[in-house]
Amino acid sequence: TTGLDPPAGAEVLDRVRAMGMEDRMAVVRAYVGERSNRRHKPGRALERTDYRFDVISDYGAFRDLQRHRLMTIEWQELTPRHGYTRPLAIDESGLAERFDDAMATSADLWSDLSERFPERAAYAVSLAYRIRYVMQFNAREAMHLIELRTSVQGHPSYRSVGQEMHRLIAEQAGHRAIAEMMTFVDHSGEPELERLQAERTAEARRATAG
């Protein structure tokens, strides 16, 4: 047999239900142990808890998140209908009008193609346009994905998705113990500047190594 037999499993559940929050948190913290970096993962017990997220993000962020394999992901057809994301850096550089014109050109081309070539029209849609998709994965994969994708080296688009996932696990799902395990989630608020600094640090290391 595998796992706990029914009486033992029921006994464990009864004991957990009788525990206070602090006692439960103590058990969780003991299970996680000390993590010196995000590659130190807790065991497979986290695979018993699943999360499902309904996400709208720009297509560029979707493509990066789609690369994670230990999950189920389903997406709608890529179109311009959900609008697009214009980075703050575009506004600050005074290029907002040119950016919007480029997005309009992309949408017009999609419209022209969609009637005759509906399956190919998506290739005309800029990566800045939003797409809606559903991601489902267990808590162990959540820790890997969220800690990786919120790091300062990440792109702001998928960083914000990961940060919101972490918040929802803690607040909406009420799984604060699991959210607390994710000690390497970065919620800092200036991702562009931090990403630039991280790139400079990496470049300096490469130069030193070379």
Language-model segment annotations:
Residues 1-210:
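A conserved ligand/cofactor-binding region detector
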